[in-house]
Amino acid sequence: MARSKSDQAFDERIAKNSEELHELLTELYGEQADEAFRNLTELMKSSYAARPADLKRLDTKRLADPEWYKRGNMFGMTMYTDLFAGDLKKLADKVPYLKEQKLTYLHLMPLLKMPHPQNDGGYAVEDFDTVDPSLGTNEDLAALTKKLRAAGISLCLDFVMNHTASSHRWAKAAQAGDPKYQDYYYCYDDRTVPDQYDAVVPEVFPATAPGNFTWSEQMHKWVLTSFYPFQWDLNYRNPSVLVSVLSSVLGLANLGVEVFRIDAVPYIWKELGTNCRNLPQVHAIVRMLRIVLECVCPAVVLKGEVVMAPKELAAYFGTPEKPECHMLYNVSI
C-alpha cells in the first residue's frame, strides 16, 4: 500500500532530524545513546501512526503557516476547569460562549491525575497519561479539544517535566525497593551526596519547603525534592526517563493538545558542583523535545516556563538553526 503524502512527509522529517537527535542523545548518554535512539525512533513512529487523521490535517495546515501562534488576533485565557465549569464535559458545553468572546487560545491549569488534597495545585502529577477523575476522562479531553478546534481555539496544557508526585507509580515502585525505578529519581543511602548538592544548590521554597532532599522512611534513602517533599525530581541521566516522558507528551498531543507549557524546565538536569539551573543538558533535552514534536505532531507549540533572570531567557528560544521553545513564560516580567 502506497504511503500518503502526510506519511511521506513524516518519513522525511524523521530522516532530516535523525542525525541531530542521535548526536544529542550521545551528548547526554554516551554508550546508552544507541538504545535510546532506537526506543525514541520507535516511539515517534508508533505515536505518528496513532495520531488521529484530523490532527494530521492540522499538522499539514500548521506546516504551511508555522507562525500561526504569533498572529495579532490571538486572544488567550487561563482557567481552572473545575472553577469555571466543574469538569471537562461541562467545559465543552461552554465552548460557544468562549468563541463569542473571540478566544483563540485556552490554557487549562493542571488536570492530569494528582493526589488529593496535597498536589501543589496539580503540579504534583500522579499519572502523566491520565486526566484526573475529578475532572473527567481522556475521552472527555479529546472531545473537548475537538470542539475547541472547530471553534478556532487551541488548547494549552501544563506538562511538569521536573518531577512526579511521590504517589506516582514509578515512585511507589522505588519506595517498594525496585532499583529500576529508584534510578528514575535521585536516591541516596546517606547524606554524603545530598550535602554536596546543598552546599551549592539554592532552595526553591526556603520558607515553606526548606532543604533539597527528603528522607523516605520506606526506602531508607534520601530523595531529591527540589520543590516540595511530595514532588520527587526525575533523573534525566536515565534515558528511560526521557523516553517515558516524551511518550506521555506525545500521547497528550494525540488527544488534541496544541500547546505545552513545560513547567520548571531550567531545573530538569542536575550536575554536582553546579547550581543545577539552566545547564547545557537542559537545552539539549528541550531541543530534543522540539525535534520530536516537529517530527510527529508539527502543529504543536512549546511554551517554556523559565522563571529565571532575564539574561537567561533568550537561550531557551534556541537558535534559528536549532530552535527550542516557540514561546517563553516568565511571571516576573
Model segments located where?
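Acidic/aromatic-lined carbohydrate-recognition and catalytic surfaces
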Residues: 1-243, 254, 265-327
